[in-house]
């Protein structure tokens, strides 16, 4: 196993802090913000979907391995619950996809934008999509009662479930 590393918090925003160059040069610094970590000049194209209409495009900033990318929200269409008990007992959901196949998604919560803590870890799942939102980006959200898409500030941290590029 690798060595554990801690993440330093930086609540300061400036012309330098929060840029792509700054984050690449300082991977162990987490930028706290009440807003999007890209601030007013955010770049919605970093994960390949600047207009919200592009599907499954790989970019150099995409955190997925070669041959995979951050999915657009259409990848989650056709998902249905197996059961509420499934989520409550297994810290995740076994989704039925398009009526036949199943796939397990853990409930990992998300790292809150304004605090150094994981919120809702036991019973909610948050998976980033490549779709930009008005104040952040969209994520696929699920718990023991529903599933949907909603926006989350980019200063928050959520899971990424990579999809194979076809």
Regions found by a protein language model. Give the residues of each.
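Aromatic-Pro/Gly-enriched surface loop or interdomain linker
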Residues: 1-21
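C-terminal, surface-exposed recognition/capping segments
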Residues: 5-12, 26, 31-166
